[in-house]
Amino acid sequence: MSAIRSALKEQRPNLSDSSLRTYSSVLSNAYKAVYPKDESIDIKNFSNDGAFMKHIATMPHPSTLLAGLVVLTKNAEYQKAMNKKIVEHKSDEQNQMKNDKQKESMIPKEDVQLALNKLKVQADHIYKTKDTSAKAMNILTNYILLCLASGIYMEPRRSLDWTEMKIKNKDDALNFYDSKTGTFIFNKYKTAKVYNQQTEKVPIELKKILDKWVKYNPNDFMLFNTKGGKLTSPNIATRLNEIFGKKVSTSALRHIYISDKFKNMPSLKELQETASAMSHSIPQMLEYIKK
């Protein structure tokens, strides 16, 4: 058992194996980024919130790392940053009031899982029979699309992040999946001008799925259409609508993921009303919350 995993287990004995794997992975990657010259990991260094907060500031999606740092160190600065992220998510939820069409696209997370399970059964059969027909490749592409966009295996990203994802003949102007290192390299995405190139370690379960697809996929792009061209954002929207039998976009899947992840949190309106009644700010109030 790694030093990080052991330390996490000591701090939180009831932490699930899945959470242990996820936290161990993101913490290990963050440590290497903050202390690139260290040959081994010194658990005490994770308490250096100044160094790690600088690294976190460069990340577009630091929630999982922050959660891991809170469990591992119980550091107050990490807890404050995590609380701030929760408030931001709730603010997004409040500001993006769903109109009737958006409400229709909001489905339970369980329905997303069911759709993924159905496609997995079809994909397993195709791999087993070595079917390379256009219909089979179309089904496999849908399966991979949902694996990437559903939020089941990783935090869901925007359509652009996947339409520009190559798996062969790397292009530095586009995104790339490196199967050797199990890493996503994002060069082309909505906030690239702010965050520049972003790399993200692929969760083990997803890596197994993608590596199998890379060997089977004859195309340079991760996702492609029946004519061999890369999928576009409208193509992805159409495919998701077909998969779910209703209008469910990548934006809706991102919203479903956030709503499910923070489903036990009170609404931002409730937080604001309570904070106002107690004459302090929401971040101040959240500092009193111990989880």
Q: For each predicted feature, which ranges?
A:
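Short, charged amphipathic recognition helices of the HTH superfamily
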Residues: 62-67, 156-164, 265-276
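Active-site/catalytic core of tyrosine-dependent DNA strand-transfer enzymes
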Residues: 201-257, 262
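C-terminal catalytic core of tyrosine-transesterase DNA break-rejoin enzymes
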Residues: 252, 256-281
